[in-house]
């Protein structure tokens, strides 16, 4: 019995030794994740912009910055909750850094607009960066860089990160949704309704005016 078990045990040790570094690399990669919360007007648009970025694993639409627990979309857009429409971006910092994300973020919004973003007006549509302690300096530097390039005062605030409430399922991945929605053009798919909304809102046109060729367009 021992003569049979010994070779098996040696084989087990050999395999374990060979596999351990591989498992270690997997664990290291699994830990190489970060996130940042950004408000840039309509969260459908911000989600669409950043889900195409290499290194970003997920973008979730939601609400943050307010004082109402578990707010609904209707409550937030009506006002009085203190919340912003925002997204939380999950990314791999070994592929894309916080600095790179903020570079793209500023070029995907009009950071000189204090009343909202594009055709969407009011507090819930204002832009903001909700920074974790280790992201504050990076955000400040990104803001100063954007301000120097535009030659105008940036009004996008850098705020302390606060609880993020995930928006209703209806709003997630709206820009590529296949469900039918009723519009003034009749029932159309969400993804087509999104394209019409974005175009009518003038988002990309305004970005070109503000940022020129550096605009981060969908």
Task: Report the location of each language-model feature.
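Bacterial N-terminal signal peptides
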Residues: 7-25
């Amino acid at each position: 019995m021992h003569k049979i078990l010994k070779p098996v045990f040696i084989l087990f040790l050999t395999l374990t030794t060979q596999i351990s570094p591989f498992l270690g690399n997997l664990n290291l990669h699994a830990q190489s994740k970060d996130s940042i919360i950004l408000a840039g007007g309509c969260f459908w648009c911000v989600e669409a912009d950043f889900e195409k970025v290499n290194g970003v694993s997920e973008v979730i639409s939601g609400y943050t910055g307010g004082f109402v627990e578990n707010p609904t979309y209707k409550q937030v857009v009506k006002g009085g909750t203190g919340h912003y429409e925002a997204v939380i971006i999950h990314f791999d910092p070994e592929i894309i850094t916080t600095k790179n994300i903020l570079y793209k973020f500023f070029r995907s919004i009009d950071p000189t607009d204090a009343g909202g973003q594009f055709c969407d007006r009011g507090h819930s549509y204002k832009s903001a960066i909700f920074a974790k302690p280790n992201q504050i300096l990076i955000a400040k530097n990104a803001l100063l860089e954007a301000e120097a390039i535009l030659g105008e005062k940036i009004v996008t605030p850098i705020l302390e990160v606060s609880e993020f409430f995930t928006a209703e399922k209806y709003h997630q991945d709206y820009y590529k949704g296949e469900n039918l929605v009723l519009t003034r053009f009749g029932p159309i798919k969400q993804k087509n309704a999104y394209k019409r909304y974005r175009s009518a809102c003038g988002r990309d046109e305004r970005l070109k005016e503000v940022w020129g060729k550096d605009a981060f367009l969908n």
